[in-house]
Amino acid sequence: MDEVFEALPADFLINVEMKVIMKGMRVIAHKAAETVRRHARWDSTLVASFNPISLWELRKTEPRINRGYIWSKTHLFPIRSRIFSPLIKANWYDPANDSYNPKLHQRFRSGGASVLAWDLDFDRDMERMAAVRLEAVVTDSLQEMLDLKQEFASRLS
């Protein structure tokens, strides 16, 4: 994380995913908090996880860090269920690929949270993403998405 924070501009949103099921979740949450704290990246870091307990631990350790709760249509582990959402008090909700839901998006937005969705759930269609007012997009094709964004912005101007 240190290398990423040092390489990218301070206002660039960085989505850090804590990939943990059970063992080590407190350690990972504390290490993530230490790194965000050391770099003072409060507004430009989102720490996300499928694991609500690790996000709760992060919230207890450093409540200033923006938390993102990832969910999926299919949950391999019951702990990934959205029933734990109130415990986490997430700032962002992050549907896993193929899990975007417009009704949930509106519910989270009305509660003051933002949604970070996968570009593939919208077939990388900027117009569709703009229509639902996505706050951010996850992509594995950064340059392609930047080009699409530029093209879309040019059409609007």
Task: Please give the residue ranges for each predicted region.
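Short loop-to-alpha-helix "cap/lid" segments that border enzyme active sites
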Residues: 2-157
